[in-house]
Amino acid sequence: VSGPCAAVLLPDSWTPSHGELFRVWLAQALTKETGDWWLLREPYRLGWQVVSPTTGPMLVEPGDWASEDQDEEACLVRAVGFRPATEVLLAAATNGLDDHRFLAHLAVATARRYGGLIDLTGQLPVPPPLGVRALDAVESGVGMAQWQARVRETLRMLGGTWQEIPYLTDRGTTAIYHVVDPDLLAAWLTHPDFRMVK
């Protein structure tokens, strides 16, 4: 997968029949390719008013939610108010702007239909402020505070609800990812800096 990804976190456990009904709903807008890969057919059914977007396949993989880190799980549960039971993983095979939009529209539609929240799998991808180099901020922390302040300000301006979830990286440093409601992600879709986390 070379494109962006996200996950819709749901409070309820899904049985095989829930999964089957979900695939029936998906088939109203998408065409099943192979396995859990789907192609966009009718974007307007996802609330996307566009003609002939250029998108690649999208992985749509519902399953049980699991966490490998108890501290991260506890932070998530405190922040969102429930322990996710089901996760619908969404991942684009390609990385064009329409793939980012396809992913976001599908995440919003899924979260609204099933009462979920959207794990962006990273912080909202707002570009760093002028004078801050992304690589320096990520690798050495130089400018990271200013960048995160800009991200938080953008989140506040978008409306909706959002939570920052801290986690420990492989390098032993603390990073964050955002979990947002569908209204916030829908507002982010209209922002000039819109893109999803890759």
Predicted regions and their residues:
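Ordered hydrophobic segments in well-structured contexts
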Residues: 4-10, 87-91, 105, 117-119
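Short, extreme N-terminal segment that most often corresponds to the first beta-strand
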Residues: 1-48, 192-198
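Acidic, proline/glycine-rich low-complexity IDRs
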Residues: 1, 105-198
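Well-ordered, non-membrane alpha-helical segments in soluble/globular domains
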Residues: 18-23, 99-105
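Short, flexible beta-strand-to-coil junctions
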Residues: 1, 11-14, 43, 91-100, ...
